[in-house]
């Protein structure tokens, strides 16, 4: 039997079981847990390579082979870190395993034929497309910015650069909901809209759900009262949608205990649960201890750095229509920004007590940095806190699974879309992000949307090869024309689907219905289900978890930062 060195094998086919890969310039290392390809039968495309007629490519018709295969990919997902080929058919994941020609090769689960395209993923990492559940639809250009960061699904609300949308993620009322669904029909990402949940009588909420929203947003700027919270959750239970909450910073209509009483044990997604983005001051962070609370962070406080506190005051004044010349407005802003709770937030993520990350796009958050900042937190916690107790080897595999779940499977579960997106699993939409390890989490090599390349770095269009400078991210065919409608999903409530909203609005994109929004619990948050006892000292703002003081040091240097953005 012929032998090949590990290094030569990795150079040719990518890493295999036992090999380790560094993620970007962080201190995070992953180790390959399993290899679903077959040694000696690996497929690879190119001159003199395997995927040729009668060799790795068979004679079957299109119906019997995949449309796309990603060869020798290193999959990083909540369920594992595995080397495999990934087959895609009709825009969905067909199989994860061994690609090739079943007529002459063993163990083939992904048949390659004349109808099959190849993306070479040797030496590359492949992740599921990210999901950002805190989108202020201030401008449509956010979709492309999100896409080039590896986010393929955007959930939120708004109508454009209006004062209401600058501050809140609400698309209010049937007319705006209809117009936003029509506008978003041409965006190259999956979308779901949130309606305005701030009313105390149910009919105004029911009509928004019937018009097409997949959730209701309760925001303090519209009045986050116990009555509004109870009403929104009552309608949500009735119509199987999610409720997202930005609670009452000023404690005007009650304290965190009153809000929890109004929630009454029902499932709810609490936005920026640390509090700098808004919520009961100073102790909204304690909500994440409850079994029905699905807590998320927005990215301006992630990770905690020397600049975090100074940056926040001006951001808050702009986004929430506050006047720096009014003392009460300044006091309101300052009450939300607490060094101690921000310092605790990173640790709560590392413990798995906070379950999701998101952006708060153009409204105190950066739409293109959800993925990047999530991994910066993971790096900071590795450096400050060392290996997690759950790790089973000399690697960071468990920590990596915990953090990737925060922007993939957990937001999908939270908003009832996990049957369609959120992980690399058979049957789900083929929203896949391909990364070179050195650029992991920062700049994707390719973003695949519904089985087609939607955006990718591309060199000089007049060059003789695709790689000469200047290289820019450019929309690809999966984001153009009517092809995009076959490669994306518009999420609707069951009531909207039954109401014929897609047909009435002439939506051309595929429609998917949210489900299971009311039964999901904190315990269902993958790798992020911890429910500790959390207390906040109302005088010092110190945070304690099960009696232990929780804090972290502000970062003065971060990975995945300036060195990646010089050009």
Swiss-Prot record:
The entry's keywords: Cytoplasm, Hydrolase, Metal-binding, Nickel
Cofactor(s) in the UniProt record: Ni cation
PTM: Carboxylation allows a single lysine to coordinate two nickel ions.
Transmembrane segments: none
Gene Ontology molecular function, alphabetical: nickel cation binding; urease activity
Binding site for substrate: 219
Pathway: Nitrogen metabolism; urea degradation; CO(2) and NH(3) from urea (urease route): step 1/1
Cofactor: how bound: Binds 2 nickel ions per subunit.
GO biological process: urea catabolic process
InterPro entries: Amidohydro-rel, Metal-dep_hydrolase_composite, Metal_Hydrolase, Urease_alpha_N_dom, Urease_alpha_subunit, Urease_AS, Urease_asu, Urease_asu_c
Pfam families, sorted: Amidohydro_1, Urease_alpha
Catalytic activity: urea + 2 H2O + H(+) = hydrogencarbonate + 2 NH4(+)
Domain Urease: 129-567
Location of the protein in the cell: Cytoplasm
Binding-site residues for Ni(2+) 2, renumbered to this chain: 217, 246, 272
Binding site for Ni(2+) 1: 134, 136, 217, 360
PANTHER family cross-referenced by the UniProt entry: UREASE
Alphabetized NCBIfam families for the sequence: PRK13206.1 (NF009685), PRK13207.1 (NF009686), urease_alph (TIGR01792)
Subunit annotation: Heterotrimer of UreA (gamma), UreB (beta) and UreC (alpha) subunits. Three heterotrimers associate to form the active enzyme.
Family in the record: Belongs to the metallo-dependent hydrolases superfamily. Urease alpha subunit family.
This protein's name: Urease subunit alpha
